[in-house]
Every structure is written in structure tokens, then in C-alpha cells.
Amino acid sequence: MKFFALFIYRPVATILLSVAITLCGILGFRMLPVAPLPQVDFPVIIVSASLPGASPETMASSVATPLERSLGRIAGVSEMTSSSSLGSTRIILQFDFDRDINGAARDVQAAINAAQSLLPSGMPSRPTYRKANPSDAPIMILTLTSDTYSQGELYDFASTQLAPTISQIDGVGDVDVGGSSLPAVRVGLNPQALFNQGVSLDDVRTAVSNANVRKPQGALEDGTHRWQIQTNDELKTAAEYQPLIIHYNNGGAVRLGDVATVTDSVQDVRNAGMTNAKPAILLMIRKLPEANIIQTVDSIRAKLPELQETIPAAIDLQIAQDRSPTIRASLEEVEQTLIISVALVILVVFLFLRSGRATIIPAVSVPVSLIGTFAAMYLCGFSLNNLSLMALTIATGFVVDDAIVVLENIARHLEAGMKPLQAALQGTREVGFTVLSMSLSLVAVFLPLLLMGGLPGRLLREFAVTLSVAIGISLLVSLTLTPMMCGWMLKASKPREQKRLRGFGRMLVALQQGYGKSLKWVLNHTRLVGVVLLGTIALNIWLYISIPKTFFPEQDTGVLMGGIQADQSISFQAMRGKLQDFMKIIRDDPAVDNVTGFTGGSRVNSGMMFITLKPRDERSETAQQIIDRLRVKLAKEPGANLFLMAVQDIRVGGRQSNASYQYTLLSDDLAALREWEPKIRKKLATLPELADVNSDQQDNGAEMNLVYDRDTMARLGIDVQAANSLLNNAFGQRQISTIYQPMNQYKVVMEVDPRYTQDISALEKMFVINNEGKAIPLSYFAKWQPANAPLSVNHQGLSAASTISFNLPTGKSLSDASAAIDRAMTQLGVPSTVRGSFAGTAQVFQETMNSQVILIIAAIATVYIVLGILYESYVHPLTILSTLPSAGVGALLALELFNAPFSLIALIGIMLLIGIVKKNAIMMVDFALEAQRHGNLTPQEAIFQACLLRFRPIMMTTLAALFGALPLVLSGGDGSELRQPLGITIVGGLVMSQLLTLYTTPVVYLFFDRLRLRFSRKPKQTVTE
């Protein structure tokens, strides 16, 4: 009591304490970073290696495997996957959450160094690594277009000037330049001209390489001067290479231009990028795992004017895609929802107390509690994101509850004629323990969340801590500022004023009287209520088992990603046409604002598209509805598929795929994997629970298989090395020399001119110069025939792997899909040599599913322990927790009604309900125990009186929590997909709980009291202390 009096009788100190809390909160708010969600990115590092011209199988065995063995020894690697395609290998390392990305990078570099001696000697450069997740959508895409400069020149500006500068910006993890390649001098050989002149391809390669040499020449000096020696040993342009003498035939010089077309072109002609309908170079910017997306985007935008000045005016630099506007809009929506919630809960107080002065008190205490929370959020390193702001929105109902309980009890004493200061002290003393019990037991709900590991634990931790801090500050404010303001602002009510009840007041009295009558009937029919209570428990179990489940609600971020997968034998020219056709279909859709895409590189039959939708207020459909509409139009394109998926703020794993969810097949027997993967994929494609089923296994590419006749080769004086060198020179876009420029290094690329490689007959024109100087056609010692070959070879760990990706059709959940996949695998009878498991987000969903029930039980157990300690009783906590089954039924029924699957957000709602609905029982039990102790009432009289006496604060706190959550249900706009499941769960649970617990709690209280008396050694003792 002295504690309360200290603040009630020292108003200046109490006000200044509240002002200090508020100022600290305002300061913290101004310094808090902004993000879509809490920081939950896994540390991911990509290791890349190249060997131009090498087949996928060669890359996998000679490059990927040695690197994997070395990288696999690094501590903290949770997953290692690799993909090897024509001339390139990429290994993706995903680390544990607690692994420092910089320390991991040092270990990766050491592992690369250790494996270097095992790698092929012909690699043009050492393997490199980048700290970025390739499966993440870019946070920003910049495009370069020009009517003056070529694509190669644009690429040069992008990779040489723009990308390095952008990479230095804080938060940027990777800048991927696509749409073309660096400028190069291309030597397109004419096989017939070479044969006529008796010049081999190796002769051309050697001549070009020897003609362009950059070596130190030294210096001359005498007694007084020194001269640096400089020669014209370098050739820079196609015009300089064209007259190069490469051979003498019968005394005549054979120049490079006589046997080849030499052009200033690009390093790899099989690349194309577009923005809308225009050729473009794309700069796809991804953030570091620990970086804040808003701060990073703002830093890039601030740098753009400076970047524009570094490139010619004829080049147009534009932002094609920016992830930040929808994130900002989503956060603005949450902030508006928070303000509306505060206004609604204050309205509840006014309606019940019908006093402007009394309403001012929660109107002050609620903002103080919420604003003060920002200071703690800053100290904890949190951000302003959808979950933390949703926590504050929900907290409005909690923090006002504490103020309501104190305020209502003080108001009750004032209505009885007590003086304000005395009423404030007496009223606070009576409910101080109640408020403490409600707050501590509510915080206890979140203890299991704080101890939860993995991605779900990291995701929910910020929500739980934010809400717990708000409750803690609210507890302090409710026991200090609220009673002080009541004592100095409120006035004692006169008896005649108490009789003037109109409007809402009269309705409340009528409700209370009706409740009293119905409660008498219920207390005389306790068995029926017991049956209802047991029924709700059974219904909870059935609803939880049957409700569709997913990991995280599908978000509409306004951005779509598309993966193009064409026939495995498609040419680059045809693939570029497919990209243009798909982009036209997408661009013509009225909901699309911008579309960019690219194709080429090591995987000719694939491409990527990035689609920006119009803002939510300019379109009526959701992202998923737009995807469903486009899917029908895109299906009409023959020879290729475009798989669309909505970009999400959370994407688990480092695998790049054409759909949102992955199912991975592993085997140590590559033949078994190649046999069963098509069977499994075709079976999954028939399931109605899955859409857009596709696979990264591409083992049906067209190949021309050459078989050497080694005996003939030996007789003709030709070795395998010379034959393979011929093929690499002719068809491998072989980099034969380097051109050094001040800003970059460029390549001289040699191949047979594409005009002579339009069909298989090109092989017949190839020849090798033997050791006698004779031209021997390839057909003399080799035979060839068409065959199938893999376009890529994939590993997970050191096992062969294939990942099947899928999306969810409208109306289907991830639990439906995972159950259907499990059934399909069982029906197919897949052998034990082929192992299947979910990956990425689907894997985390499986892990979360297994822990959800344990988490709920742990929360209930924690609350029971806290209540047992507070009440020094084993029984009363059970009475209080008996309110939970009805809340669970209401929450699950509401989700079913709104066709919302049970997600991680809904789980938060269930956890919150555990804390919310028990408040009603705490208020009833507290006053019933007090009445038994000091009023000499029977248990039935005590609980009946407690129910009637606490009816008004119970209704106030429930409606406050309900109105606090209602804006989440009704909110639209950006980010509503995250807010609505939480609001639906809470509102549904509160409505059902309020209808039932007003009756079930008294019955359970009496049941346990009778049970206690039956087993008590002292039957005359009324209350368990």
C-alpha cells in the first residue's frame, strides 16, 4: 500500500517519470530502422567457378566435387547445394543463424585455397565467392538503355563503373549484371578458307595469342638519362587484328582477315536482356543477409545522381524495380491500424464509464506505455516492421486492460461516495495483485516463444519481446500514473447521478441483470456446462487436425518473379524469341506496371523475369489472382513454360527455383535418380493440390557424341589432345588472348563463324593438321551421332540431387500439398536408394508443424506455473485456464470461416488468446477468493457475486481487446495478408470465449472447490491459501 501511496501523493514525480518514459520512447522511435519483417535471413555464400566449354558432367566431377569436399568441412554449414552447367559451377552454402557471415567468408576463402591444387589447370580464373542469397528477389533492379551505344558497351559501363560503386554501398551484398557480356574481339573462322590455306585452328590461336603480348621491356640508360622501352606489342581492336599474318602458304602471307571475320563484339553472344520491349542491361541488386532493406535502398537512391554523372548522357539509367514502396506502404497501413486501435479502445472506456475525465486517463496511459516501448525496441536492436507494429497494435488492448481494471475499480468506489484520493488508494490496493497476475501470466505465455530456435523462433522473438515490454511498461503505468490521475482528476459521484442511466449505461445494467439471471440457471445445471466444456476440448482437437495449415501467409508485395523453362534442345535465338513473347503477354496485362527479363549464359533454355505490379489502390486483384489469370494465357505458348510466383519477404534456403516450394530427391546412385525423378515429377503434376510442378533436373539436352577411332588416329599422326583442342577452338567460344585497358580487361574470343555451324554438317568441315603438316578431316578418324546429355548436374552435400518445385493452387494450403506428396511417394513405391525430403520454406513448415502443439502446451504449462506461484494453489490456475478451450474453438472456426489457413501468424494469435481470455477468469477468481476470505460467503455465493461485480470490467477489457484487434481484420491495402490472420484469430477467440467463459468459469471454480473439500483433511477450511 505504501508503494501505491508514494505515487498517488506525489503527482509531480509521477508525471515526470511518465514524461521521461515518453521522451525515451520518442528518441528510440526516431532511431529505429524500418524493415518489412524482423531480420531472419540465413547467412548464405555463393562460390562460383568457370571453365569455358566444359560439359556439365565435367564441371561437376572436376570442379564442383573437389570444392564441395573442401567446403563441406567448414563449421556451421547447414546446407550445401551445387549446380554445374555448361562451363560453370555454382555452390551455395547456407550457414546456421548464429554464424557470422564475415567469419564464414574467411573460412570459405581458405577452403577454396585448399582445393586449388585439385582443380583443372585450364580454368581462366580462380573460384570466387559472394555474400548474397541467389534465391532472394533483388531489392532493386536498374536498367541501362541507349539508342547510341551497343549492348556490349552498356554492359561495360554497368560492370566496370556502376556495379563496383554500388557494391561499396552499405548493405549491398551482390550486384549481378545481366543482359549481355563484356566487349570482346571475336574471331569467326571460315573452315573452308582455313583448309584451302592449310592453316589449323591451333595455328590461328597461337598466332593471335603471340601477337598480343603485354610483357615488361625494361629500360635503357646512360650517365645522364634513362629511357623506358615501350613497344606496339598489343592489339586493341578488330581492325588491328584483321591484317595479322598467321601463316605463309607457298611464300604468300595468310592474314587473319583472309580466313576469318574479325569484329568488335561481346564475349558471349548468347545473352539477352530486356525492359518492357526494349533491349537493356540489368543491374540486379541484392542485399547482405544482415542488411536493412529500406536503408540500403535509400542509400542506392541517394547515389544514383552521382552514378548518372559517371556515364555518358546518351545512356538512360532507370529504376525498373524497387521493393521499398510496398514495404513503406505496408508499414503505413500498420501505423494507421495502430492509431485506429488506440482510438477504439479509448472509445470503449468512454462508453462504459460515461465520463470525459475518466476517459482522459487511459487516453494518456495507453500512449505512454506504447511510446515507451520504442526505447526498449531500440536497445534490443529491433526494427519498425510489420510484426513489431502488429505487436503494438495488439498491445493497445492489453495495456488499456490494466488501466481499465484499476480505473473501473476506483470509479466504483467513487460511485459509492468515497473521496478521490482515498478511492484511488483503496481501489488500486484491491486490484494491484489482479493486475500483477494478469500481466505476469500474459508475459509468461511468450517465454516458450523466446526459447524457440530456428527461423520461427527468430521471427517471433521480436514480436514477443515487443509485446512483453509494452505489458511491463503498462503494468508500471497502471499502478503509478493511472491511480495518481484518478485521485487528482476524478470527482466523487453523487447518488442522484448514479440513478440517471441513459443509453449505453442503461443497456449495460440490463445486460448485467440478464447475465445474473442466466448465471443462476447455469449454476443449477452444472453438468450441462461440464459437457459443453468437454465438447469444446474435443472440438479444438478436431479443428486443429482438420484445418489447412501453411508456414506464412502468402503476401502481395506487388512484385512477381518468373522462371522460363524451355525445351532442353532449344537454341539461343529461339529462346530469345520465347522471352520476347512472354514479356509481351505480361506487359499487355492491365495490372502490370513494368517487366524486365533476361536469358542466356550457361543455361540457354532458361530465363528470368521480374514483374512490378501497379500499386494496390490501382488494381482490384491480388497478386495470386493476377498469376492465375496470366497462367491461362501463358500456357498457350508452345515449347516453353513461364512459372510465376509472388515475391515474399521470407524465402528460406539458397536454391533458385521456378516456384515457391521445393521437394528434393537425393541419391548416391545417379542412374536411379534419373530413372525415378521423371516418374515422381509426372505423378506430382497430376495432383490437384499442386500447381506449376517443374524440376531442375535437365538430362535430356541434345548432344552430338563423337567417337574417336584411336587406331586410325595413331596411324594418321593425330592425338586426342589435338582433336579436343580442335573442337574447343571451333565451338567453345574459346578465350585466346587478353586485351588490357585502363578500366578493365577484355578477351579475344575465337570460334567457327556461326554462319558455318547452323547444322551438323559443320563437323564435316573440321580438320586437324597432323605431325606431317597434312590437313586431316575430322570425319577420317571420328564418327558422331545424336544423343542426350544433361544440361546441368546438381548436388546436395556430396549426393546427386534433383529438386522438384511447385506452387499452391488457389484454395489449397501447404499442408494439403505436403500430405499429397507423401501419399504419392508411398503409392509410387520409390526405392530406398532415392530419398525425398522437403526443402527451403516447405522444410521449415514441416519442422514448425512438429513443434506447434508442443509450443502451445509449453505456453499453457508456463502460465500454470506462474499462476500457481502467485496463488499458492494447484487448483485455481486450472480454473483460470479452463477459459482456453472456448477461445481455441472460436479462433479456429473464424479461420475456417474466412478460408484462412493456420499459419505462424495464426499461431501467434492462439498464444495471445492464452494470455487474453484468462484475464476474465483471474478477475472472477480474485474477487471470489477475497469474498470467501473476508466476506464469509459460501463458494457459490462468492463466485456469483464476483461474476456480477466484475461483469463491467470483464466486458470493458474484452471489448477493448476486441476493438484493438478489429482493425487488423478489417484492414486492407499493402500487408493486410499478414495482419488479417492475427486479427481473425483474436476476434474469433474473444467472441466465443466471452460467450462461454462467463458461465464455464464459475462452474469450474465450484467443481474444483468441491473436489478440494473432498480430498481436504480439513473439510471446514473454505479457501486454499
Swiss-Prot record:
What are the record keywords, sorted? Cell inner membrane, Cell membrane, Membrane, Transmembrane, Transmembrane helix, Transport
The cysteines joined by S-S bonds are none
Any single GO molecular-function term of the entry would be:
bile acid transmembrane transporter activity
Gene Ontology process terms (BP): bile acid and bile salt transport; xenobiotic detoxification by transmembrane export across the cell outer membrane; xenobiotic transport
This protein's GO cellular component annotations are: efflux pump complex; periplasmic side of plasma membrane; plasma membrane
* Highest rank taxon of the organism: Bacteria
Q: Where in the cell is it found?
A: Cell inner membrane
- Broad class of where this protein is predominantly found: membrane
Entry membrane topology: Multi-pass membrane protein
Q: Which family does it belong to?
A: Belongs to the resistance-nodulation-cell division (RND) (TC 2.A.6) family. MdtC subfamily.
PANTHER family, per database record: MULTIDRUG RESISTANCE PROTEIN MDTC (PTHR32063:SF34), PTHR32063
- NCBIfam families given for it? PRK10614.1, RND_permease_2
What's the subunit arrangement here?
Part of a tripartite efflux system composed of MdtA, MdtB and MdtC. MdtC forms a heteromultimer with MdtB.
Protein name (database record): Multidrug resistance protein MdtC
